[in-house]
Amino acid sequence: MVAKAMANESRANAEQQAMINRLANEFADELNNLGVRVSNLENKVGNVKVTGDARLRYQGSDKKGEISSDNTNKKSLFDMRGRVQFNANVNDNTSAVIRVTSGDMEFGDSTTSDVEFDRVYVAHKFGKDTTAVAGRFGAFVGNGLVYDDTFDGAAVNYDNGNFSATAAYGSFMEGGLFNNGSMSSYAHDFSDATSDENATVTLLQAKAKLGEHATVGGFYTFGNKNLDNDIYGGSLDLNYGKVWLGGEYATFSDKDGTLVQSNDKDAWVAGIGYGDYDIAKEGTWGVKVQYFDEGKYSPVISSTFNQPYNSDYKAWMASVDYALAKNVGLSGYWAFNAEDQSGNDLGDYYRAELNYKF
């Protein structure tokens, strides 16, 4: 009956076609067994894949005002975030992606909801190893110490499994640079800038596997319009089964010489971890301990790590991840023995979150 309906689908109205598509999808195996051609069934039922995630997060600090810049008396914060992503196949080599996010919404605060599109881009594959993207996408600089967030522009990436290289041009869209004390006159806020105000950068980076256990990487970010600083760095990762050791270093050069007098302009992180955490695999877990040292004029903008400060910060951080169920993960972080570069105590920082993938 379904096969006959598919054969006469052109005569059906829109409602009937939708019903035929649903039935064809439901009985795909049976139709195949009967010899009915359903190889293009995915084109009938749509070529858009919907994925997403939801997060419930708690943050706390020993000191007031470090969790929320809007409330200097607050020592803890409980918020939530939801994101939905649409991946559409335009053809065999081209795809379009749109992601909607709620932003971080604090529980009980009716003013923090801010739904927006944080991913809108197209991607085209050239052969097996090369992909070009353009639009608003996610950029991962180096190992993520300096930047892991939204990027507006275009990029070309090559990755054969053992060696990868990326060239990109555009603007960072989140975080801030040099927004610290005496450097405020040189600061740049990427998250609150018009297209005329925002800086543009050219990013070149590469990463290679050295044997079975080591991976080394490096990047160089050229400051273009509205940014007179080049940011660069390198990383090393060692993996031995479930054991990981790694670190990353980043600094900047000042092209016009105004900041040369500063010697405290670098940032680095090093750590060790154990485990095989995968949120898609129930019961997997991982633990990690890292040490962060970020100078007063650190080039960190929006880091992949969950340290509470981008600059003038030194601390240890312990973290643990556990997959409670398939696609449900619990993570906890504790930053301790924290101080600024002058030795002043900054207090401990705590973070716990539940993540859901779908």
Name each region found by the language model.
Residues 151-155, 186, 306-310:
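Short, low-complexity, polar/charged sequence segments that are solvent-exposed and flexible
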Residues 186, 193, 204-206, 234:
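Compositionally biased, intrinsically disordered low-complexity segments
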Residues 10-14, 18, 22, 38, ...:
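Outer-membrane beta-barrel pore domains
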Residues 46-49, 53-56, 73-182, 198-215, ...:
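Outer membrane beta-barrel
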